[in-house]
C-alpha cells in the first residue's frame, strides 16, 4: 500500500518525507478544493522531496467543466511541471452533463 500526503507547502513536503510517505499530491488553495501549485513551489518540493510528486492540475476555481482556454492552461501546466520532474498529475474534467469529459481527459493523459 502506498501512503500519499496532500500538501500545499515545502514544509508539508518535508513533513511527508519525515513520515516516509511514498508520494505527495501537491496542490494550492485547498479551501477552493485544490488548484494548480505555482511552478516555484513545484521546483522547491522537487529539490527537497525525494519521493513521487503528483500535482493538481486545476487552474481556476469553479466546476470541473472546462472550456478550450482552461484546457490549454492545464496542458501548459503539465508540460512545465514535467520539465521540473514531477511523476504524475491529478485532475478531473466533466461535461456540461456532469459526465467524464473523455475527449479532454484523453488530451491530458496522452501528453
Language-model features, listed with the residues they occupy:
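Extended substrate/RNA-proximal surfaces in nucleic-acid metabolism proteins
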Residues: 75-82
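Low-complexity, flexible helical/coil segments
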Residues: 39-44, 57-64, 87-95
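A structural motif
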Residues: 21, 50, 85-86
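Active-site-adjacent beta->alpha loops and helix N-cap segments on the catalytic face
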Residues: 10-14, 18, 30-51, 69-72, ...
